[in-house]
A protein has these predicted regions:
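Catalytic alpha/beta active-site cores
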Residues: 2-3, 82, 88-395, 402-409, ...
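N-terminal-proximal low-complexity accessory segments that begin disordered
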Residues: 2-91, 99
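Hydrophobic alpha-helical scaffolding
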Residues: 7, 11, 26, 30, ...
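Generic recognition of stable, solvent-exposed alpha-helical segments in well-folded globular domains
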Residues: 12, 16, 20, 31, ...
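Generic, well-ordered alpha-helical scaffold segments in large soluble proteins
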Residues: 16, 20, 24, 39, ...
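Intrinsically disordered or highly flexible coil/loop and linker segments, enriched in small
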Residues: 26-31, 46-53, 67-74, 89-93, ...
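Acidic, glycine-enriched catalytic cores built around paired aspartates
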Residues: 81-85, 89-139, 143, 147-148, ...
Length: 714
């Protein structure tokens, strides 16, 4: 009798998954699929119960915190902190130490720059992101709201010369600032003197000009573009007076942009079925083998995309060299709370998906460890989300060691990025870094998930401030400062990335340029952006500001953050004085955000997309956005700031808004007027069951209704 699986050791392995590992992943590697699954079985046997026990500990701690708040309506900060220490929520400080991570690529340890995050499920998006290592500054200025799209500057017709001239003016201003000329401006350049040994420009007044800092000149590209270097970032100046529509001879400026890219299996991806998960692994395999490609139709034309080749240059001494044409990629695995039935135990129970991710993405990375194209240092970079405290970090480090042994990989090849996005990790960040000290290459902050956990952890304590006002609370600024100061205290300077969160408005590039410099000023060596265009524009910040110099100042001041502020819960001020109008605005905003994201997740399997908010501004949303919005509504409902009836009305009203926002999509399935589709049910359940959802995570409900949708469709 045929089955859909085969038994290997103590596992039931889905047949299509076995075939994928056997015929695709192991092809070209010195390991067989049977050996791989036998090793996976042994690792699951060793770590599965540990995974379960760590999740039990989360529940136990949350239960104790809930009880404490129910019995302590007025919070004494000292007593509260002592309580958290007594129950093991806060762990002992590990003392002074420095991380000992080795074999880290320069993109992580030596270069500050933008970082993209891209769902692994979409080949086209993955290729766009990884190929965004270099980007045209002219295109990004001309095509975005950095230059207002109105009056004589409109983009309503091709090659608006006034807009082109303004684009070139902005680019020349940028060059004058970051690579200045002696007694001249880039506006005056007509051409470059064809000489390799030094950089000399012809000016429109007949004179010559050179760089104030001649060491910034690195060489020439194969087609004669000028390669400069500033703050460890490269840029190309394209001189071509014949093609230039501007009075100067500068045709374009090509910036090194997305230095690193996180290829995401987690919050921005939706992989409910086995086929979807295998598709995600296959895309990552294409990246590591360097043969990923995508073919699609745009405006009636067939377009094919593949990974960029390296860029070739000749240096000032006439020697040939190359620079990477692609981002260095990291891979984000799922958290330890996720499970899969693609590989089951013999009793048909699900296994931890995080363990499977660690094994499979590491197996796939063996292709790059042979080629040394992505990582020149022979490392593999795994970003691990949703870790709660040092015990879970240690568990992950032990797991990585076992994966290395199983796959015959050199010790400490698997590096880790730790997301500082859960409250227990924030309060124990130094201890978390200590547990990962020989592997850690990345820490970062993220407002959405971190606030979602802040709300859920203190759910019983009281009603929280309006979602957009929580950033004004003391805990949040301390959280952001603490991440940088603890990271530098532990020796991450020029060894590992310290990151900041996403700019969520992909169409608002002028606003991004005005606001995102604060991440660099805070000491962050990388910061998340939503698109290749945003990466190129954000790269201008890193040219203008030396992050490593700022980090040195922070280290020299040795100023500790006031960690007591981390315990200040962001309560709603004077809830009795909150007007009904403000309540309705808040719950409408949250309901619209939830519906706009969930309807695409359930009906289309899209884990990350640009969703219009209630004011029709496009926002990049993933499950982190959903977590904070659903937990905030659940909190207000629990504390009777609003009623169930008000929330039901908000969801129905906002479903009509979301339907109208998507009416031009021929594949969109409206939620109104019946309000009984799976997307609508999932959205409301996320709120009405929000208090019960472990840590406020949304996956269980999303997956349940996505499965129902797929079953109904089939």
């Amino acid at each position: 009798m045929s089955t859909d699986h085969q038994i290997i050791n103590e596992l039931k392995v889905d047949n299509i998954f076995f075939d994928f590992i056997d015929k695709e992943v192991c092809n070209g590697l010195d390991i067989s699929a049977i050996d791989f699954f036998q090793s996976l079985s042994e690792i699951l046997n060793k770590y599965q119960n540990q995974n379960i026990n760590l999740l039990k500990k989360r529940k136990e701690l949350q239960s104790k915190i809930d009880d404490w708040h129910l019995n302590n309506k007025r919070i004494d900060q000292k007593k509260y902190k002592n309580f958290l220490e007594d129950i093991g929520y806060i762990t002992p400080n590990p003392g002074e130490f420095k991380i000992g991570v080795e074999e880290v690529d320069d993109e992580i340890s030596q270069i500050s720059g933008p970082q993209l995050v891209v769902p692994v499920t979409n080949q086209r998006f993955v290729l766009n992101a990884v190929n965004a290592r270099w980007g045209s500054l002219f295109d990004c200025l001309y095509g975005t709201n950095v230059i207002p799209n109105k009056g004589s500057m409109t983009t309503s017709f091709a090659h608006n010369l006034q807009r082109v001239n303004h684009t070139a003016e902005l680019a020349c201003e940028f060059l004058d600032e970051i690579a200045p000329l002696k007694g001249a401006s880039y506006r005056q350049i007509t051409s470059q003197v064809k000489y390799t040994g030094a950089l000399i420009f012809n000016l429109n007044n007949g004179e010559l000009a050179t760089l104030i800092n001649p060491e910034q000149y690195i060489g020439l590209s194969e087609n004669g573009n000028i390669l400069l270097k500033n703050n460890d970032l490269h840029l190309e100046i394209v001189c071509d007076q014949e093609r230039s529509l501007h009075k100067s001879g500068i045709f374009d400026v090509i910036l090194e942009s997305a230095i690193t890219t996180i290829v995401d299996f987690e919050d921005s991806a939706s992989t409910v079925t086995n086929e979807e998960k295998i598709h995600a692994y296959r895309n990552y395999l294409g990246l590591m083998r360097r043969d990923l490609n995508s073919t699609f139709t745009k405006n009636g034309h067939t377009i094919s995309r593949s990974l960029n080749k390296d860029k070739e240059y000749t240096d000032v001494n006439g020697k040939k060299f190359s620079l990477s044409g692609t981002s260095l990629t990291l891979v984000r695995n799922v958290g330890i709370h996720m499970t899969t039935k693609m590989v089951r135990n013999l009793d048909d129970s699900a296994t931890p998906e995080g363990i499977l991710d660690a094994m499979v993405t590491s197996l796939i990375a063996l292709h790059d460890l042979k080629l040394k194209v992505n990582s020149k240092k022979g490392s593999m970079y795994i970003v691990k989300p949703k870790l709660h405290g040092p015990d879970e970090v240690k568990y992950t480090m032990d797991l990585f060691s076992s994966v290395e042994k199983a796959l015959s990989i050199r010790k400490n090849t698997l590096k880790i990025g730790v997301m500082d996005e859960e409250r227990r990790t924030t309060l124990n960040l130094k201890a978390c870094i200590y547990e990962a000290r020989d592997r850690i290459i990345f820490i970062n902050t993220g407002f959405l998930d971190r606030t979602g956990d802040e709300i859920h952890t203190s759910m019983m304590a009281g009603a929280m401030r309006s979602k957009n006002l929580i950033k004004e609370e003391p805990w949040y600024s301390t959280y952001e400062q603490n991440n940088v100061s603890i990271g530098l205290e532990c020796g991450l300077y020029k060894k590992a990335q310290i990151g900041k969160g996403m700019w969520a408005q992909p169409d608002q590039m002028r606003e991004m340029l005005d606001n995102k410099m604060v991440h660099l000023e805070a000491g962050a060596s990388c910061s998340w952006v939503p698109s290749p265009t945003a990466a190129t524009l954000h790269a201008t910040h890193y040219h203008r500001f030396n992050v490593f110099r700022r980090q040195q100042k922070i280290i020299s001041k040795d100023k500790k953050t006031n960690q007591d502020d981390l315990f200040i819960i962001p309560f709603l001020k004077l809830p009795d004085q909150l007007s009904e109008e403000k309540i309705i605005i808040e719950i409408n905003n949250n309901a619209q955000s939830i519906l706009g994201y969930v309807v695409r997740w359930i009906n289309h399997g899209v884990g990350c997309s640009k969703v219009q908010d209630i004011n029709h501004v496009g926002l990049m949303e993933d499950r982190a956005t959903l977590r904070i919005s659903s937990q905030h509504m659940a909190n207000w409902l629990y504390h009777e700031i609003c009623s169930k009836e008000q929330i039901e009305k908000a969801f129905k009203d906002m479903a009509i808004v979301v339907d109208n926002q998507n009416k031009h999509d021929p594949n969109y399935l409206p939620m109104s007027p019946k309000f009984n589709c799976y997307a609508f049910k999932a959205s409301t359940e996320l709120v009405f069951e929000g208090v019960k959802q472990e840590n406020g995570y949304t996956e269980d409900i999303l997956i349940k209704y996505r499965q129902k949708f797929l079953e109904a469709r089939s």
